[in-house]
């Protein structure tokens, strides 16, 4: 039906627009249903059946979105999926059953420990009795710096910046303590570089207009879909709703490469600034910042250390795509990187079924995807993914 409208020569672009709209519609439906069931499960923590259903739906949503990223015009036509993989992982990490060594669980444990430190400090200040107990700061939590470097490696930039924002040096600097100045200056340098990490967002205006035109026509038939077809889930709405989308953003692959090279040079200059590190009296802070910076420029050993020796292969894959293989293509080195990360970390013992699904998708093997879906997901999902593939 799409191909029959207008110029027949535009059949391919219309088919792609239709595929994007279809994928977005199913994704939105899955997201809505998953969120509704997850909310019910949170209100009934003893209901194991409801918790299982919530986990299944979250995994289904993650699987669908990854299929869409790989099979529906990867990289919005560029073929480059590094940034898309990063965003997909950020949104779905908690549904991927990464285990206690995965970043979601490690971050949850860290925040709990920081909350305990804050509570104990508050109780000590109120009592005013125990002057011998050591005062602890957020950065004294056991996984503070390891979580920070993991957040940087996996592209959870806002969370990484929020975490270093808890460091005690900021308050000390504001109070005029000179010893805190070199600590804050080093952290400031890292945060500034994180904020200006280059991005690639290549979406043609004519494609946006066409998607919205077709989408509006489809959306009128069902009021509930008005935010999907031509609405909240269009490329334009997602792009324009992102406050940082036009900052340090390349609009072509060559421009992104140039932006990235210039940015890496800036990061390397900070790494090579020995005075900046030598004046920092906190060795853990200096080591944490250096590890983060080395990860940002794509040093392979730094990336592996940042995600952790016991991390899931998927975390190493995403971190490598973000920091080293920044122009990763489905038709290029994606499968090779996948195999390398699995060889390094091993397959997941927590969810072999989800592993099979994700691996088949990242290998862009449509028949393997269909086979895995038929084994591990329901008939509704299989019917819809068959339409996409």
Question: Which residue ranges define each predicted feature?
Answer:
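Compositionally biased, long intrinsically disordered regions
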Residues: 1-133, 141-153, 158-310, 314
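Extended alpha-helical solenoid scaffold regions that build the rod-like backbones
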Residues: 145, 272-389
